[in-house]
Amino acid sequence: KGMAILGAHIDSPRLDIKQNPLYEDTELAYLDTHYYGGIKKYQWVTLPLAIHGVIAKKDGTIVDVCIGEDENDPVFCVTDLLIHLAGENMEKKANKVIEGEALDILVGSRPLKGAEKEAVSKQILSILKEKYDMEEEDFLSAELEVVPAGKSRESGLDASMIMAYGQDDRVCAYTSLVAMLEVENTEYTTCCLLVDKEEIGSVGATGMRS
């Protein structure tokens, strides 16, 4: 009787795209986001970002989305002020320099030819239609997440470390799973629990509290 249990969480801080996200401001197109998990908001500005997720279209089909990971893909960013315009911001505490509502991602600046109003937003919609056969209403049934773009890399001259998004807590998730699969002659049944929602309090049907 008994069980040997290993546990880790597999969710990481990120930006989630809202359900009605596309808007235009000063001839620039943005996607409205809200942050998920415990993030240092000032670290997310002027950082190359990628969009991952799925779009559930009205006809029931599912479209996988991954923009920003291939070297030929465009990337996205959260904008920031130039240093000589940011004097007031630089005097704020770190948790106030960038507010959560300022973490919207810049997605375009080129207007659609012939469009009179919100021409940049319309250009973005035309690209989404061309590449993903996506309408603006499809954002309502999409799950799209924004994360730092780029693959994991070895770090240090001795390559003794790994630099990558999401090491908290996937480094523990990977080692826990491998340990369970490779252990021999165990006294107890082995179990590995990999859960999400830890970043927001372990709530929900797939969090540890369930």
Language-model features: locations:
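N-terminal hydrophobic/helix-forming segments and targeting peptides
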Residues: K1-S210
